[in-house]
């Protein structure tokens, strides 16, 4: 844990990390908030689901573009405009009528204007710390973001029931704008400049490390979302039990990230972490005792954050600075696509075979994710696995420039 203590002593690290997590908090609220609000307006879960899907599509399509703009035009103008447009769109949806066309349009606009904070901050991490500190910072970020998916849905549900269904959307708009402003003020000493590189849009996808990270994270997120469907189908008779079960997996991911994420994880360790996810997921489908199911879910979560942080670190080391934001934008889009694919496949499997169908889909997807690094390594060397700038760099990292 010393690696994390060294991190918090670096001036600005805590402020930057906390501000970007706060600004991204609405991502954990939006899906449920929009579902509850649109269903209340229209009386249709189908229409509400379509608007939520429109948000996901807008974000998946636009994120690589806005992330690239942050690297080309500058972080401050890109994030500022995106936050203002996204916040205004959320407010518009909160007070819009029940017109399906208007709601769908606002859904796409909300998704397309989500500030590319994740790509930007992960491209900036190597500028904040050096040597082993980068590894620990990626681990801390990946682990801490679990809080978004724990706090967000709870906050959305509470506000919708205690105040109104518009309340979580209004809060999301405020947090997006204020959180982005906080992040920009916190990161101002980094002086992010406009990238000088001239690579064409999408060229970063020719990098084998980026492809590996994107495909693996897509499958891993798809597995987790499919598992959520299986958990709800199996334990959904009591909403509290299902929610607690999902939280147990998230706690496992958080603990796994804290204990393992900052360590030197090569390809073999990444495969082992992904295999743990697959094994834990499969065990959840096999055991029929609630306590054992919780243990299996905790075990499945242990490998999630360490594997994701290692993949992000590989990409950070491998891609050129001027392509970093776009690369992480593609990873974000891959994760969004994975979530949609996992949920859809698990839904079909649940209709046909019950909860075991969704869990089987989740286990298969996690197994495929574990195979990806092995296939990539068999095809040739994977860049970014080792630090080319020398692991000898002292972990006592300099303050932000």
List the predicted regions and their residue ranges.
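Intracellular juxtamembrane helix-capping segments at the cytosolic ends
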Residues: 34, 115-129, 306-319
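A late C-terminal transmembrane helix in Major Facilitator Superfamily
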Residues: 322-355
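Cytoplasmic helix-loop-helix junction between adjacent transmembrane helices
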Residues: 107-147
